[in-house]
Every structure is written in structure tokens, then in C-alpha cells.
Design a protein with these regions (language model features):
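Ligand-binding pockets and gating/stacking loops
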Residues: 1-175
Length: 175
């Protein structure tokens, strides 16, 4: 009960990446506003959308949608075709990743980590990264890019990807 009281009033940020053909990122999903309200501003409408369960909290949330990952596009000829392998790293950094299959990765600090640095000091866990897919790929993925770019959206520094938790029990135990 004391921890619930302490958490009340704290500012939080949740960043959800939808890639690789999820319904909300297709032309159909965008037209149906599956993950983005049709109207912008304080009068946004959460129905009918996947966001409807957030309706009781609408006065406390801000939804940023329809962002792009243009920096995942190829800048040079050898990068052509690697957009998918760069997009997750670009999502919150908006930086173009260094093409490498080694440990010398470099992309940029992600916005969630800037947020955690500013608002997270007053919380027991300033930042937590969760995922629903396996992230245990090793080595290079394709097009000369390290798998860490595909597997990571949060970066504490340009060369420091943050590991994600897939197991709900591990996340619960940390909380």
C-alpha cells in the first residue's frame, strides 16, 4: 500500500514499437485508427481502437503516434535492404546506426533514457525494457548490421544498448 501511494503522481513514459506488419502499422490499421486516435489534441477519441482500455486514464495520457523511422532508410548503397534491421534502433533514437556486425555499435541515446534521466531519479526503477519476442540472436543479422540493432529500442548511450526482459516473472520480481 505504501509503495502504491509513493508511485501515485509519478510521471511515466511507455514507448511501444510496432513493426514488421503489425495490424496498426498497415494501411488497413492506419485507416481504422487501430493504434492511433483519429483526432489529435485533448479531444482524441479512443474508440474504436486498440487503445479503448485506456479511456479511464485519458486525462492523464498523451499519445504520440504516426512517427517515422526515416533514419532507418539506406544512406549508402551497401545499406540498401537493411531498413528492417535498423528500424528498432532508430525508433527512439532517430539516429542512423553504424553499419557493423561487431561490438562497436553506435546509434544514439534513446528518448526514453533522456526521460528516465530527468524523471526517473525519484523511482525505484527509472527504466524498464520489456519485449514479447526472443532477443537472443547472436552475431550479425543481415546487411552488415549487428542483431542488437534489431533487438533493442532503448539505448542509455550511443554505444550502450539496454537489455529487454521477456519473462513476465522476471519483470514482476524486479518490480
Amino acid at each position: 500500500r505504501a509503495s502504491a501511494q509513493a508511485a501515485r503522481g509519478k510521471v511515466r513514459l511507455a514507448a511501444i514499437e510496432m513493426v514488421h506488419g503489425s495490424a496498426g502499422s498497415t494501411a488497413f490499421g492506419i485507416k481504422k485508427n487501430m493504434w492511433a486516435p483519429a483526432a489529435v489534441g485533448r479531444d482524441f477519441d479512443l474508440s474504436p481502437s486498440s487503445l479503448l482500455p485506456l479511456e479511464p486514464y485519458r486525462e492523464h495520457i498523451t499519445i504520440i503516434s504516426n512517427t517515422d523511422v526515416r533514419n532507418a532508410e539506406a544512406f549508402t548503397a551497401p545499406e540498401i535492404g537493411g531498413d528492417h534491421f535498423r528500424s528498432s534502433a532508430v525508433f527512439l533514437t532517430q539516429c542512423h546506426p553504424k553499419q557493423t556486425q561487431g561490438s562497436d555499435v553506435n546509434v544514439g541515446t534513446s528518448i526514453d533514457q533522456f526521460y528516465a534521466q530527468k524523471f526517473g531519479q525519484d523511482t525505484a526503477i527509472p527504466s524498464m525494457q520489456l519485449c514479447i519476442e526472443n532477443v537472443d540472436q547472436a552475431g550479425g543479422c543481415a546487411y552488415g548490421y549487428s542483431c542488437v540493432y534489431t533487438d533493442t529500442i532503448s539505448w542509455s548511450a550511443p554505444t550502450q544498448p539496454l537489455p529487454m526482459i521477456r519473462d513476465p516473472r522476471v519483470a514482476f520480481d524486479q518490480l
